[in-house]
């Protein structure tokens, strides 16, 4: 697809991008390879023929199934201890279900293509409770900061479980989600890229610490065929990556840059870039992707959020570990909802609480548990680390390549 003429990103551009990123029911039946619309909002490979092509043919797991479970426990403890130490967090309980009326569920992106599971509960009630299974605890966590009386510099993490029914199920995308969802209170003066980078660096230190702990118990995880994660990750703005690879869609840009820089944090996900598309769709009511910032070279940028991605030497593919960011304040919440045409969200209690300064300013994110285990334990598929439902075809494709998904 030819690159469109660069233009200054803005509200009109963001609205246009949102309109182009239609829900699956509205989208064209066929998207040409290289079309930047194809992966705006959607994780997953999208066809099992493609999955067959990309999975390694020479895979041999380093740890067997029993050893893998032991290593998962070691890595899990190391990450949770590290989060508490590096970010001053405490563990709190997290809901699996929330009320629909609260507006606290996570819709993941802004095109409406990933809807939560709705159901009624409360046998014997005159009016049953309209509830939803959480897709992530993103918005709930910010409310929890107030509930638990967190001061700036204090925060919480949760052992979050969720269901995302609208994902394509492949080797690294599942309908069952296990995350360390975390949130930390902050002050207004921390709403800048320097603070964001410091938090990301602390998170990376936690991940590397977990890698070392797993390797203490299982030294053979230090395998030259599958290099360890780098000691430090590098920061790039989505706009900078677009300038480096202007003709590639988002996932291919990520794949290219990760081959040279195997651990990166991509800043500014959600704002419309110079080619007229956001790097990826991002919901308008938690991460701040609208705030103006400046690149290392002095160029105008936007966004106080991003993703941690690494190169997976087993699958030879991009591998996302975390999505996070400084959260919207009352001004940027309204700006972003106006851009996405969702000002009606302001009626919900969560959004009203932000507008009325009833919730702390915060930074937070989600770290995929099975995704971290997959990276640290040099696995080819999420299903080697977590138990969920997979189509039989995926079981067969994986088994033919010595990848055995748990049942």
Q: What do these predicted regions represent?
A:
Residues 1, 12, 16, 21, ...:
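Hydrophobic/aromatic hotspots within intrinsically disordered, low-complexity regions
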Residues 31-407:
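Structured aminoacyl-transfer and RNA-binding surfaces used for tRNA recognition/handling
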Residues 5-10:
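Low-complexity, polybasic segments enriched for Lys interleaved with small residues
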């Amino acid at each position: 697809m030819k690159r469109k003429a660069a233009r200054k990103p803005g509200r009109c551009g963001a609205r246009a991008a949102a309109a182009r990123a239609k829900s699956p029911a509205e989208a064209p039946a066929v998207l040409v390879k290289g079309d930047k619309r194809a992966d705006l909002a959607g994780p997953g490979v999208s066809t099992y023929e493609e999955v067959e092509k990309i999975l390694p043919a020479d895979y041999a797991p380093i740890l067997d199934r029993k050893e893998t479970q032991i290593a998962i426990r070691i890595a899990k403890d190391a990450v949770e201890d590290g989060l508490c130490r590096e970010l001053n967090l405490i563990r709190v309980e997290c809901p699996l279900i929330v009320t629909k009326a609260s507006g606290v569920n996570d819709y993941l992106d802004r095109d409406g293509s990933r809807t939560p599971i709705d159901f009624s509960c409360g046998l014997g009630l005159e009016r049953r409770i309209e509830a939803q299974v959480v897709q992530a605890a993103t918005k709930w966590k910010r409310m929890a900061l107030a509930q638990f009386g967190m001061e700036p510099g204090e925060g919480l993490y949760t052992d979050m479980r969720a269901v995302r029914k609208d994902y394509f199920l492949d080797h690294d995308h599942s309908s069952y989600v296990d995350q360390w969802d975390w949130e930390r209170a902050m002050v207004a003066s921390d709403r800048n890229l320097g603070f964001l980078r410091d938090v990301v660096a602390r998170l990376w230190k936690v991940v590397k610490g977990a890698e070392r702990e797993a390797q203490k118990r299982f030294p053979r995880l230090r395998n030259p065929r599958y290099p360890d994660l780098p000691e430090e990750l590098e920061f790039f703005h989505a706009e900078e990556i677009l300038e480096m690879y202007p003709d590639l869609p988002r996932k291919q840009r990520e794949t290219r840059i990760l081959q040279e820089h195997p651990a990166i944090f991509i800043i500014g996900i959600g704002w419309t870039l110079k080619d007229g598309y956001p790097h990826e769709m991002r919901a308008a009511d938690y991460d701040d992707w609208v705030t103006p910032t400046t690149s290392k070279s002095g160029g105008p940028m936007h966004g106080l959020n991003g993703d941690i991605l690494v190169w997976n030497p087993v699958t030879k593919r991009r591998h996302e570990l975390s999505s996070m960011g400084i959260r919207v304040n009352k001004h940027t919440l309204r700006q972003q909802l106006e851009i996405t045409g969702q000002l009606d969200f302001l009626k919900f209690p969560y959004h009203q609480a932000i507008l009325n300064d009833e919730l702390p300013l915060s930074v937070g994110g989600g770290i995929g548990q099975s995704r971290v285990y997959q990276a640290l334990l040099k696995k080819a598929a999420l299903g080697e680390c977590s138990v969920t439902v997979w189509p039989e075809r995926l079981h067969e494709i994986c088994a033919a390549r010595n990848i055995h998904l748990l049942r």
